[in-house]
Design a protein with these regions (language model features):
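Signal peptide-directed secreted proteins
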Residues: 1-4, 156
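Sequence context surrounding c-type heme c attachment/ligation sites in exported
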Residues: 33-67, 71-156
Length: 156
């Protein structure tokens, strides 16, 4: 490579590394109430997109593969969103999160990983227009949601 190209690549890399560090610092400075609001919004949106699929699975609405595929795609993305909002600085904020979510972060993260994996299965089945696969995967998503809420969410 030309010398100027090497310098350009190194400079770009340095900017990216510095930018990543600034991004991490910025997240660490987000106010706890904002993090709680972010995770609550992500959970509410998951419910919004899961609800119509659930209605179809129960027979309360006709099965629509296009709606399932769209909603499952949203769910795949939303399933990854709330977790960076569950940090120790938010433990004193008003929310339904049980203290165990912060005391055993590895176990809590495993529950989050399970939800992400199950929504990925749902998304794959939905994009393949595989109704039987969607039904099976929906059960996995519902179970992952329920078990995490049972363990880490206060009852209303």
């Amino acid at each position: 490579l030309e010398a100027w190209m090497k310098k350009s690549i190194l400079a770009t890399g340095a900017v990216l590394v510095l930018g990543m560090g600034i991004g991490a610092d910025a997240l660490a400075q987000v106010k706890p109430d904002v993090l709680v609001a972010q995770r609550q919004a992500a959970m509410k949106l998951q419910g919004k997109y899961l609800g119509p699929i659930g209605a179809m699975m129960k027979g309360a609405a006709p099965y629509n593969a296009d709606v399932v595929a769209l909603n499952a795609t949203f769910l795949e993305n939303l399933a990854r969103m709330p977790w960076d909002g569950f940090v120790p600085s938010t433990s004193g904020e008003k929310s339904k999160t049980k203290p165990d979510a912060f005391k055993d972060a590895a176990k809590f993260r495993a529950a989050a990983d399970l939800l992400e994996a199950e929504t990925a299965k749902l998304g794959a089945a939905a994009r393949a227009k595989n109704e039987a696969g969607v039904r099976a995967a929906f059960g996995g998503v519902a179970k992952a949601c329920g078990s995490c809420h049972d363990a880490y969410r206060e009852k209303s």
